[in-house]
Structure formats: structure tokens, C-alpha cells
A protein has these predicted regions:
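Short glycine/serine/threonine-biased micro-segments
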Residues: 124-126, 162, 217-219
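A generic structural signal for ordered secondary structure
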Residues: 2, 179-183, 228-236
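Catalytic-core segments of hydrolase enzymes
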Residues: 1-26, 32-36, 41-149, 203-205
């Protein structure tokens, strides 16, 4: 059930197959829409998507009731920051298992972001692991204060500094493209596939002796293209 900041409550709503319910609160203009998916196509899990329209300011309370006997667990996420006001947050948030799609997909190389200048984890990056226990992200790539083209001015490219996991994904994509060129176009390993590509980068990843791997932030380690070739060449780093 749901309780508004003013104390108004919506009773327990039982889940139904592909059911969508909508309520309007008496006090104020707040409306809530709950979309139930008993068998999510992507995960197979039971999912409830909750949308609040014109929500009243204050603390909203959501209470989940277990309808059947046995073990039960649930997880809740807010949309990414670009989709909600900065003041919307959980009272007691947990930063783990906060990667966004498609990083959780199987046979996909998921990356988090870190600061390559001081090797610190980027605070706004999502973290693993996947809810089914799979190691996600696989790697961390540079994603803080990177130089990017932000436009054109009088025929010249304007360069700016930016941070984010989308930049880390771009850096990782570039590394994969160059490695695939070496494997396929240059004829060094023409039979490479997606799984083996991921394994090459995992085995060549840079790892800090002070951390244990795999972990929720850096996965199996940091992107290290030179480390991949060292591993191929049989060079053991100290």
C-alpha cells in the first residue's frame, strides 16, 4: 500500500497479470499509477512500475505485503537523475546493484567509470552485482574529466571536459574496436567472438593489490589494453 505525505493511504493492491491501476488522492492533485508485470519479458521477475504525477512534497511511504508463504525479497530503484528532480531520493539508499540496462545483459561487457588520474571510483557510477549473482560490471574504464568535442566555433572544434559512465562506455568501445581490428583485419585471431573478446579484456585488466576481485565497483579490474597484449605474449607483471 501507499501513504502520501499527508497521511492518506491507498489500500493493499493485489498483483494481477498485466494489470494497471490508477488512483487520485483526495487532498491535493497527486495521482499514482501502478503497472504490474507478473513475468517481466527481460528478467522473468515480478515487476511493479510506479508512476507519481504531481506528487505532494514530503515523504511517500510504500509498504510491500507478501501474499504467499516462503522466502521473499524485493528491490526498488528510482529513475536515473536526468529523469527526476534532484530532491527525489530514498531515505536509506543502497548504492549496490544500480547499473542500468543493458549493462546487466548476458554476453555484454558492462563497465563502470573511474578517475584515471587518482584511480578513485566515480561516485555517480552504477555498481554491481547483478541480482542473480553474475559479476557486473566486468570492468571499469576512465570516465572522469575526459576531453570531448562539444561543438564548433568559427570552424574550430570546441573541446570541453565531461564525466559519466557513457564516456567510460565510449572509451571501452574504442578499445574493443581497435582490438577487433588487430584480431580480424590483421589476421591475428579471426575466429574471435563476443565472449572471447570479453575474456581477453578481463584477463588483461589492471588490478590494485589493495583490493579483492571481482568487486562491485571495478568488477574484474580496470581497462588496460597493454595488459591484454602482455597476457597474450605471456608477460607476467610484477
Amino acid at each position: 500500500k501507499v501513504r502520501s505525505p499527508g497521511g492518506e493511504e491507498i489500500p493493499v493492491i493485489s498483483s494481477r497479470l498485466e494489470q494497471e491501476v490508477e488512483y487520485s488522492f483526495v487532498y491535493g492533485r497527486s495521482r499514482i499509477r501502478i503497472d504490474y508485470r507478473l513475468n517481466d519479458l527481460a528478467t522473468g521477475s515480478e515487476v511493479a512500475v510506479v508512476r507519481l504525477e504531481e506528487p505532494a512534497a514530503g515523504v511517500w511511504t510504500f509498504q510491500l505485503v507478501q501474499e504467499s508463504a516462503g522466502y521473499g525479497a524485493f528491490h526498488m530503484w528510482l529513475p536515473i537523475r536526468q529523469f527526476v528532480d534532484g530532491s527525489v531520493e530514498f531515505l536509506r539508499p543502497n548504492p549496490d546493484s544500480t547499473l542500468t540496462a543493458p549493462a546487466y545483459a548476458e554476453d555484454v561487457l558492462g563497465v563502470s567509470a573511474y578517475n584515471s588520474r587518482n584511480n578513485s571510483f566515480y561516485v555517480n557510477s552504477g555498481r554491481g552485482f547483478a541480482l542473480d549473482g553474475r559479476i557486473k560490471p566486468e570492468l571499469a574504464a576512465p570516465g572522469v574529466d575526459l576531453s570531448v568535442a562539444s561543438g564548433m566555433l568559427r570552424g574550430s572544434t570546441v573541446v570541453a571536459s565531461a564525466s559519466g559512465t557513457s564516456l567510460a562506455a565510449a572509451v571501452m568501445s574504442g578499445a574493443c574496436a581497435q582490438f577487433l581490428q588487430w584480431c580480424v583485419q590483421d589476421g591475428n585471431y579471426p575466429d574471435i567472438n563476443g565472449t572471447s573478446l570479453i575474456n581477453f579484456f578481463v584477463r588483461g585488466a589492471a588490478r590494485d593489490a589493495s583490493q579483492s576481485y571481482p568487486n562491485r565497483t571495478f568488477g574484474f579490474g580496470k581497462l588496460d589494453v597493454a595488459g591484454v597484449f602482455d597476457w597474450i605474449a605471456g608477460i607476467v607483471r610484477g
